[in-house]
């Protein structure tokens, strides 16, 4: 057996907290980008072409990653792995992502540090883009923070399972908990797919979620190695 410190459960008031400064900074950047594009859409400044140009130059294009497409500028292929997450398909898309960010960040706030949060956020966004690039449609750009959000969800699933196991719950109970999480995330994807008329980058969700799972499992193994117990 291993005598490692158990992951702490999220406090009951976690969802009601004000997000930490890092999360607030991320929200400010995402909202700032969308505000600029909204103003252009409404002809308050700039040009109405700003949004399509932003998608063309900053969205994630699977065709570029797979090869055979010409980039609009040198370095677009690696850059789009990052830039796509700062763009959204409109206010409702942005609002949904920001609400999810606050909720997930607050649930994880007492479980991981800010640097680890940022590292996982970036890794999950990259993983989501990579999986979308592998199996997503080549002719449609992917934008949004969903890959990163599902990475946080993946880590939360692992941490919840580890917490239940450390509390002495049976393997069956832990697996049921994980299954409930997976069914909930699947229902969320199906609901989003229906609301968006079939336009959903589920590939990015999958990639980010797998990255979060892998992060959580690797984190647990590293913790167990630092705190070995009697055999």
PLM regions with names:
Residues 2-231:
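A detector for small-residue-rich transmembrane helices and their helix-helix packing motifs
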């Amino acid at each position: 057996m291993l005598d490692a410190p158990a992951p702490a459960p999220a406090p009951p008031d976690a969802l009601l907290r004000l997000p930490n400064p890092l999360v607030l900074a991320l929200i400010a950047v995402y909202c700032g980008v969308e505000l600029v594009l909204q103003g252009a859409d409404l002809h308050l400044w700039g040009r109405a072409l700003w949004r399509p140009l932003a998608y063309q130059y900053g969205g994630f294009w699977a065709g570029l990653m797979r090869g055979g497409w010409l980039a609009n500028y040198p370095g677009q292929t690696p850059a789009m792995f990052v830039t796509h997450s700062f763009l959204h398909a409109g206010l409702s898309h942005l609002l949904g992502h920001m609400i999810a960010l606050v909720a997930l960040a607050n649930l994880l706030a007492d479980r991981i540090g800010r640097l680890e949060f940022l590292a996982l956020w970036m890794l999950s966004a990259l993983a989501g883009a990579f999986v979308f690039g592998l199996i997503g449609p080549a002719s449609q750009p992917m934008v949004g923070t969903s890959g990163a959000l599902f990475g946080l969800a993946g880590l939360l699933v692992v941490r919840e399972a580890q917490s239940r196991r450390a509390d002495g719950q049976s393997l069956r109970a832990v697996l049921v908990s994980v299954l409930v999480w997976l069914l909930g995330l699947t229902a969320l994807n199906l609901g989003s797919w229906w609301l968006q008329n079939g336009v959903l980058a589920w590939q990015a969700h999958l990639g980010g979620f797998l990255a979060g799972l892998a992060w959580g499992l690797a984190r647990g193994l590293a913790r167990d190695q630092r705190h070995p117990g009697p055999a």
